[in-house]
Structures are given as structure tokens and as C-alpha cells.
């Protein structure tokens, strides 16, 4: 279906024809733990990766398979792996690339949970991270060490929607034989496809825009199929015979899909952050309307940004669409159709004013999720990024007066009226 446009792909990939077992037009929920093999040789071929297909519910499921194929197609990748959450997708990606004694270079203005994973949790397993100003290309390159295994970015930083120069950083990573990993949760494949700009691996918290309705946890890892694991010489777990899977070289057995096949066969097998069939089904429902929802998110966001930029109680609006934003040129390059419906602004009066404003909102829900059809709000310094030190918060541009908004799809006049009454 490669000739079809995004809006068609989001509806059909993975189930081009009706379900063969039931003739169902909708993707069925295959609520099963196990699959019957035709005979002993068939079972052996499945376990030996000689025959693609279901082995056990912790590894694959037919509902999950449709979801994976669909997101891979939307991102322009060769294969994907769905997980129980976005955090699991990010963790598996790093664990597949780095082992004890290895190093990651990461953009410092990322989601607080990802920052904490890299800064604290993974250090317990011997993986260290250098956080960099992604706008300083020299700093990015100079931070690469002999034991560096990946460069990690977000298409739109959390919470301030800052934008890295993906093309330039991809060139740096590839110069050093490293894959570029990009979290495209906030960008979505409808607005930007990082693989087209040099990304090798794309991750999502599918809980956000892909699901879109605040009902379902899930994550997904997309393999571009473009990184040469053998030529790099740094990833023996993928390119060389793997003793944990009877000597299989995943680069040989799975070809372009080696990366996600390794995660499925080893990390998912051993640690089990498996997405449920029901969650995969719900995320498919969200995927079918992704383009329609994103268009409304973007349209509403433009008007909210304009409203806030002209409000006397607002000190600063952190949105790259504004001409005076330092990433405005990158925004125009990478997001020609708009974007960044999750962003922050600084209210005058600091924390007290921020709390008062948030507590007066009526349509906006105060919660930790983002990218819902409903408008959402939170105070990052005391919640999502509260694990960061005062220095780290300042370094990421998060102040006591910073408020994060996630603009939903409600009527724009109702959204603006709610914001205005909260200021008053």
C-alpha cells in the first residue's frame, strides 16, 4: 500500500482485506495467550525464526501485529514493536543499544521521566548519559565517546516544544557509526517523519496522540531498517551470533528489521512489557482518526498561542511558531503544517499565580497526561519534572511560573473563554 496517502494508510495497513477467519472488517481482538502449531517442525521453525508468525502471547499477537504494521508504515519504517507503555519502548530501545560500561548522548530538554531513566535508573546498570544542548552541534559531537552507543532526541521537547536540527545531528551520529533515536510522541508521523531526516529508530508513547483519548497505555518502537549493524562494529548483540538465542545473528536472520526483532526475541521475551491485545485494539481505533485530530489540535493551538502572546498577565510563551522563538526557523523547516499543541507559558507572579490560574480552569483537566482530545494542564516544576534539581529545572527552561498546556479539540471559543476566566 506504499502508494497510498497517510489518511488511507492509517485506516488500512495491516488489514488490507477482511479478517480471513471471520470476514470481519474491523480488526478482531485476539484475546489469547498461545497459538497452536501445525506440527513439531512448524513449532521448531517458528522458534528458530525460520517461519514468521505467532509463538506465544508475550511476544506477538495478531491484533498487536496490525497495530505494529500500521505505525511502521505511517513512520516510513520497515517494522515495529508495540510495548505496554511509552516508558517500556524507550527503556527497551536503550537497553538494546547499550550495556554496562556504555554511554548515551541525549538532548537535555526531554520528558522528565526519560531524563530520570537516563540520569538515574540506567546508571544502576552501568549505562551513563551526557545531556547536551541539542542546539550546539559542537557540544553534541564533542560529547561522543568511544563507548557511546546512541544519540537520543525528541522531535518536540517536553515541556517547552524546543526543536533540534534532526538532519544535522543525524549526520553527526552517522559520522561516528551511531544510530539516532528520536522520540516522536509530540510530533506524530502526520506532522513529521524523523526517518526521512536521518533517524534510525523512532519511539512513541502511543498513550498520547496515537491513542488520543486518554484511555490506553502503550508504546511503540519503529525500526527504519537503514542502520547497518554489522558495519558499525559496535553492536555484537544484534550483528554477531547471540548466545541467548542459540547463536542467531539477528542482522542475518531478520535483515532490515534486526533491531526490533532483537528486542522482541530477547528483551520482551525475558522482561515481558507486553501490550495487551485489547490495548492494541484501542490504539488502532485512535490511529484511524490521527490525521483528523491532529489538524484540529494544530488549528486550536495557533489561536491559543496568539491569545497568550498578547495577554498582559503572561510573561513569556514558549512556542516555536512565534517569530521571536529561537527555534522558529527549525519549526518552519520541520513542521510546515504546524504543530506543538503541547507547550508552556510563564505566568507573571510565579508559583502562586500558576497554582491559582490552574485551579480556576474549568475545561482544562489537571493531570499528568498530554495529547488527549480534551485540553489538559499541569505545573511541570512540581509534578512531571519534580525529580529534577533546581539547577536542572533552570537549565531546561522550567520555572515556578511555568504552566504546561495540552490543547484539545474542543470548540476554540470555549477554550479561550476558559483561559480568560482563569486569568481573571
Where does each model-flagged region fall?
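Short conserved active-site loop signatures built around small residues
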Residues: 1-30, 221
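Conserved PLP-enzyme active-site core in the AAT-like
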Residues: 2, 14, 18, 80-311
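Conserved N-terminal alpha-helix of the aminotransferase class I/II PLP-enzyme fold
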Residues: 39-88, 113-120
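Glycine-centered tight turns that cap/initiate beta-strands
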Residues: 76, 147, 313-316, 363, ...
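PLP-dependent enzyme catalytic core of the Aspartate aminotransferase-like
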Residues: 119, 128, 146, 293, ...
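Active-site beta-loop-alpha junctions enriched in small/polar residues
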Residues: 156, 185-187, 322, 348, ...
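Short hydrophobic/aromatic beta-strand micro-patches
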Residues: 222, 344-346, 406-408
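Conserved small-domain helix->loop->beta segment predominantly found in fold-type I
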Residues: 271-274, 278-280, 285, 289, ...
Amino acid at each position: 500500500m506504499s502508494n497510498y496517502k497517510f489518511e488511507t494508510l492509517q485506516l488500512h495497513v495491516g488489514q488490507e482485506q477482511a479478517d480471513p477467519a471471520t470476514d470481519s472488517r474491523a480488526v478482531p481482538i485476539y484475546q489469547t495467550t498461545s497459538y497452536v502449531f501445525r506440527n513439531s517442525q512448524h513449532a521448531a521453525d517458528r522458534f528458530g525464526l525460520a517461519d514468521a508468525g505467532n509463538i506465544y502471547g508475550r511476544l506477538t499477537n495478531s491484533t498487536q501485529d496490525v497495530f505494529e504494521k500500521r505505525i511502521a508504515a505511517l513512520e516510513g519504517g520497515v517494522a515495529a514493536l508495540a510495548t505496554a507503555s511509552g516508558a517500556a519502548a524507550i527503556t527497551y530501545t536503550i537497553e538494546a543499544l547499550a550495556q554496562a560500561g556504555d554511554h548515551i548522548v541525549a538532548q537535555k530538554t526531554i520528558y522528565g521521566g526519560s531524563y530520570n531513566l537516563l540520569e538515574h535508573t540506567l546508571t544502576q546498570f552501568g549505562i551513563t548519559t551526557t545531556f547536551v544542548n541539542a542546539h550546539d552541534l559542537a557540544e553534541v559531537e564533542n560529547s561522543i565517546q568511544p563507548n557511546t552507543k546512541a544519540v537520543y532526541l525528541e522531535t518536540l521537547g517536553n515541556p517547552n516544544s524546543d526543536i533540534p536540527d534532526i538532519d544535522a545531528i543525524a549526520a553527526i551520529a552517522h559520522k561516528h557509526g551511531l544510530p539516532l533515536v528520536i522520540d516522536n510522541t509530540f510530533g506524530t508521523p502526520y506532522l513529521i517523519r524523523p526517518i526521512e531526516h536521518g533517524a534510525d529508530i523512532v519511539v512513541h508513547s502511543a498513550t498520547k496522540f496515537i491513542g488520543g483519548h486518554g484511555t490506553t497505555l502503550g508504546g511503540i518502537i519503529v525500526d527504519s531498517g537503514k542502520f547497518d549493524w554489522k558495519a558499525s562494529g559496535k553492536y555484537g548483540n544484534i550483528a554477531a551470533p547471540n548466545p541467548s538465542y542459540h547463536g542467531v545473528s539477528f542482522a542475518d536472520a531478520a535483515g532490515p528489521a534486526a533491531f526490533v526483532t532483537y528486542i522482541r526475541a530477547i528483551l520482551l521475551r525475558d522482561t515481558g512489557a507486553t501490550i495487551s491485545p485489547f490495548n492494541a485494539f484501542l490504539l488502532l481505533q485512535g490511529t484511524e482518526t490521527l490525521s483528523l485530530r491532529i489538524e484540529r489540535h494544530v488549528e486550536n493551538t495557533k489561536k491559543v498561542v496568539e491569545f497568550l502572546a498578547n495577554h498582559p498577565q503572561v510573561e513569556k510563551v514558549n512556542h516555536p511558531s512565534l517569530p521571536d522563538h529561537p527555534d522558529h526557523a527549525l519549526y518552519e523547516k520541520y513542521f510546515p503544517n504546524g504543530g506543538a499543541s503541547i507547550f508552556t507559558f510563564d505566568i507573571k507572579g510565579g508559583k502562586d499565580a500558576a497554582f491559582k490560574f490552574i485551579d480556576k480552569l474549568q475545561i482544562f483537566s489537571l493531570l499528568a497526561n498530554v495529547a488527549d482530545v480534551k485540553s489538559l494542564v499541569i505545573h511541570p516544576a512540581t509534578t512531571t519534572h519534580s525529580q529534577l534539581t533546581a539547577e536542572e529545572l533552570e537549565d531546561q527552561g522550567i520555572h515556578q511560573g511555568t504552566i504546561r498546556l495540552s490543547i484539545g479539540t474542543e470548540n476554540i471559543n470555549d477554550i479561550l473563554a476558559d483561559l480568560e476566566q482563569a486569568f481573571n
